[in-house]
Amino acid sequence: MLVFVAGAQSSAPDLKTRIQKLIDSSGGEVAVALRSVDGRTELLIDADKSFHAASTMKVPVMIELFRQAEAGTLKLDDQLPVKNEFHSIVDGSVYQLDPGDDSDSVVYANAGKTMSLRDLCEQMITVSSNFAANLLIERLGVENIRHTVTRLGADGMQVLRGVEDNKAFDRGMNNTTTARGLMVLMEKIATGHAVNPSADAEMAAMLKRQHFNDAIPAGLPPGTVVGHKTGSITKIHNDAAIVYGPKPYVLVVLVRGIQDQKVSAALIASISREVWAAAAK
């Protein structure tokens, strides 16, 4: 289903046609959610279909960290022991993360030491550290993260567990999201309504320091400022972005069923390019 409301109505059918053509020729399942930061324009394609969240679930973890800091429950400069030991949500059994399956080396280099909550969040967002994410999830509490997701109205997003809980994965107990749910969270950050304007500005700055830029940013003109969070596992490739163009907007693209991540990245970049072109009119 595609919905396009308010603003730029004349471009809606053309944009729908172009995006749908890209999706139809991709061989994968794709969900798209677009909303201008001023709230006047919205485009939804299968935006309520559930996908594996992969590392995009780290966005609500970040929001909950800053919420607890605002509430005085913790301070961002608090130190947390770096210990590679986590507990499955299935039976409480202990498991460890494999550095070879992670995209970060900094947190592993600090094993047995401590790192600040702020630095762990930086690693979790900018290089998608699974180790940092699991440490933060255990510190913050998954129930608190879920409550914040619900409070912010991100229906369709569910955070159940940390990364590499294989017992949970084998039972289908996964973190999931919809394109609409992720869009809502990114929009809250963009507009200063996730936690507060100061905290949201710091979160947006972290998103702008993202290292993996081959999807939504690749479809934008060089130099365009974008804050985003990617997520990928086998046959899953997601990107959720705040694009700071002349008419700022939030764009989320979720892709399922494409084996080659270079192909899925190119698809997301193509959708991003079409959205930018429509927004520029």
What role is predicted for each listed range?
Residues 40, 52-80, 124, 251:
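Active-site SXXK
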Residues 11-22, 42, 139-141, 184-214, ...:
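Structured C-terminal helix/loop/strand segments within mature extracytoplasmic catalytic/sensor domains
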Residues 67-91, 146, 196-199:
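Short, well-structured active-site flanking segments
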Residues 29, 113-117, 121, 127-186, ...:
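Mid-domain, small-residue-enriched loop/turn segments at the edges of structured enzyme/sensor domains
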Residues 21-51, 74:
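Short, conserved catalytic-motif segment at the N-terminal edge
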Residues 12-16, 50-59, 73, 110-118, ...:
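Solvent-exposed, acidic/flexible segments
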Residues 87-134:
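Conserved catalytic neighborhood of penicillin-recognizing serine enzymes
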Residues 2-13:
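Bacterial Sec-dependent signal peptides at the C-terminal "C-region" and cleavage site
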